[in-house]
Amino acid sequence: LPRDVRAGGLAIRIRDFDRCAAIVVTSDTSIIQKLEQRIRGISVRAAAVTAELAELKHERVRETVSQLQREHAAPSGTATLLTAVKSSLNKMRQEQKTGDHSESLLQSADALRNLRHLQFLCWKDATAGLCSPAASPHTTAFATLPDHWRLMNRVQSERSQLANHLRWSATFDDAGSLQRDGWERAAADKTLFSTTTDVIPAGAGGRVLRLAAWPADPTGRSAVRDDVVPLVLTSPVVAVSPGDIVIVRGRVRRGSAVASGSRSPLLLYDTELGPEHGLKQELTSDWQEFELIRPIHRGREFQLCASVLTQAEVHLDDVQFHLIEAGTSETPVRMIGTSGR
């Protein structure tokens, strides 16, 4: 291996470090010999299995890219990577015929590495315009990226007239808006956390929603349980139908009244997908806009939940619910899991 002697030690650069690679540092060279013997013993099987995996992954990725290109231009570098993968697979097949299992394994690993890079490029391209990957339900897997772009194309076609799809909004202009609009509050046991949800002044005559939680024991001697959510505030119900698309927009920031050790103390999620697909942004004292795009699969009622995960103060404002009604049979909007594998 290339070695670079530096002050305090030795720097070694390892090329093509794969996910299954191993580094052994030992003064007993017999260990290396035993390891090499084990590798030779499984080399035939390892080469065959890795070759099969590379072939299957190439077919799956190629198929997904083909579907994606019907909805959106593939990112730069896609064609080059696919060409490199094909070249590696051709070399791998040739090495299998000659019985060079070690080289066959290296070519398979090279193909898999380029396929992972291609998947990452497509995912990065898909999430570039979102406030978070969690904003769209179809960015959680490479196989559903075609569904993501189909969803984005449908939303983009309505962007210019999104105001016409506004179903409900909350600007928290007065102290009674929470109760009047029908927000629901759920808090942890008072022996664990003290909490508040109220509307407070925010300069220039405006008001914002404040959510805050802090330990009930001011001395800090009581243990704070990680499995307890201090505060959850749930929005009023918005009626929906399967095939609709709900877009929730708003802005959020960190307050200063309660110190928090977490950079992401707030979880925003919806009743269609649940907290597992929630949005956790790193909050600062500056306002950050958020947007959740949710295709409705089977729900009839849709709500936004704002969950304070630890001691913190956060502010929420300008919450808007937009509803794009279900597409036609000619332009359907697919739900989670309807394409890909």
Locate each region found by the language model.
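Extracellular and organelle-lumenal recognition/adhesion modules and their flexible linkers in secreted
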Residues: 143-341
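C-terminal beta-strand-rich structural cap/linker in extracellular carbohydrate-active enzymes
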Residues: 11-37
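Carbohydrate-interacting/catalytic domains
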Residues: 1-7
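Short alpha-helix capping/helix-loop boundary micro-motifs
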Residues: 7-12, 232-233
